[in-house]
């Protein structure tokens, strides 16, 4: 699609979103577009420090969990001594960027709003690690904590998954992997999904949206996919193209959040319509005036905080519902 045919989203953003787009962090160098992947990872970590500041204080603990691929670092956020459930968080970053520090504030706020222990999983990044390694690491982490719950003062009778962007795909894929492989790590009471990608290769929103402002041009999306997958056949795998999985039965309740001007919004719309058509419990909410990744910007955007609280309310409601 010719760039001039795309919707001029920068003129249609909310005032809060415009303020974020126009915000210049003092002393922050430009994005190293020609840098290697490690340089870009370090820049992303540096750029996210501002957005992670002033997060709620609570007890945290770091734990290295053994997996078939080696130890994976996890971070436990415990807002109170006892917890009614455990929520596993998978960070976004296109499978190639991000870690527990880049999403620290998001996890702290989720822990505060749910009152539950949140466990961030620092899964191995692509292209060094390819599909399905991140999913298998996540499942191994869940299995480990289900077997060592008392040691970490966890309630793993009720668990959930949450994630943003690529992390949302990993969250839903991991829950489906547990179901499909008959692995029990606790009762999955809810999945919280913020602006994820779920397997579409093309869509109206991918044609109309995406640019330098969000790092989600068609070329960007192709690059993330090629870094993550082992080969072209993986595109059709039911744990990558989740629409090729069975979404007609036993899907845990899903909170599906999208950003209005996100090229990935049609993934969320299709997921919601599919689950709804098959009477699978779900809730969909679109946040007007926003771009992809807006969840990071709760220091300046009240709607980002609203989106986190909406997900937390969904999760807490499922804690009280027998399943």
From Swiss-Prot:
Q: In the UniProt entry, which residues are flagged as the active site? A: 165, 262, 292
Q: Which Pfam families match?
A: Abhydrolase_3
Q: Where is this motif: Involved in the stabilization of the negatively charged intermediate by the formation of the oxyanion hole?
A: 91-93
The main place the protein resides is cytoplasm
Top-rank taxon of the source lineage equals: Bacteria
A single Gene Ontology molecular function, please?
carboxylic ester hydrolase activity
A GO term from the CC aspect: cytoplasm
InterPro entries according to UniProt: AB_hydrolase_3, AB_hydrolase_fold, Acetyl_esterase, GDXG_lipolytic_enzyme, Lipase_GDXG_put_SER_AS
What does the record give as EC number? Answer: 3.1.1.-
The record's subcellular locations are: Cytoplasm
Q: Which controlled-vocabulary keywords does the entry list?
A: Cytoplasm, Hydrolase, Serine esterase
Q: Describe the family membership recorded for this protein in Swiss-Prot or TrEMBL.
A: Belongs to the 'GDXG' lipolytic enzyme family.
Q: How does it assemble?
A: Homodimer. Interacts with MalT and MelA.
What the protein does comes down to: Displays esterase activity towards short chain fatty esters (acyl chain length of up to 8 carbons). Able to hydrolyze triacetylglycerol (triacetin) and tributyrylglycerol (tributyrin), but not trioleylglycerol (triolein) or cholesterol oleate. Negatively regulates MalT activity by antagonizing maltotriose binding. Inhibits MelA galactosidase activity.
Q: What is this protein called?
A: Acetyl esterase
- Source organism per entry reads Salmonella dublin (strain CT_02021853)
């Amino acid at each position: 699609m010719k760039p001039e045919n795309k919707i001029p989203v920068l003129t249609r953003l909310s005032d809060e979103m415009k303020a974020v787009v126009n915000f210049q962090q003092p002393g922050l160098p430009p994005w190293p577009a020609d840098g290697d992947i490690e340089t870009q990872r370090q820049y992303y970590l540096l750029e996210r420090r501002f957005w992670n500041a002033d997060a709620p204080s609570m007890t945290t603990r770091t734990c290295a969990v053994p997996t078939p691929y080696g130890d994976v670092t996890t971070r436990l956020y415990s807002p109170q001594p006892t917890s009614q459930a455990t929520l596993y968080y998978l960070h976004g970053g296109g499978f190639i960027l991000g870690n527990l520090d880049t999403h620290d504030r998001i996890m702290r706020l989720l822990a505060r709003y749910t009152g539950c222990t949140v466990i961030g999983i620092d899964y191995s990044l692509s292209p060094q690690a390819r599909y399905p390694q991140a999913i298998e690491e996540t499942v191994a982490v869940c299995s480990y904590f289900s077997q060592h719950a008392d040691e970490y003062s966890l309630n793993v009778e009720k668990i959930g998954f949450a994630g943003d962007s690529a992390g949302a795909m990993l969250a839903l894929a991991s829950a489906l992997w547990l179901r499909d492989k008959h692995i029990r790590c606790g009762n999955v009471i809810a999945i919280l999904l913020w602006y994820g990608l779920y397997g579409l290769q093309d869509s109206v929103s991918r044609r109309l949206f995406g640019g330098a402002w969000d790092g989600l041009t068609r070329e960007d999306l192709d690059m993330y996919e090629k870094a993550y997958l082992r080969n072209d056949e993986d595109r059709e795998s039911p744990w990558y193209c989740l629409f090729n999985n069975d979404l007609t039965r036993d899907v845990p309740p899903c909170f599906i959040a999208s950003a209005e001007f996100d090229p990935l919004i049609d993934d969320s719309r299709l997921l919601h319509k599919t689950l709804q058509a098959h009477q699978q419990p779900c809730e969909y909410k679109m946040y007007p005036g926003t771009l992809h990744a807006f969840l990071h910007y709760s220091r300046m955007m009240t709607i980002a905080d609203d989106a986190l609280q909406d997900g937390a309310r969904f999760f807490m409601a499922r804690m009280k519902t027998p399943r």
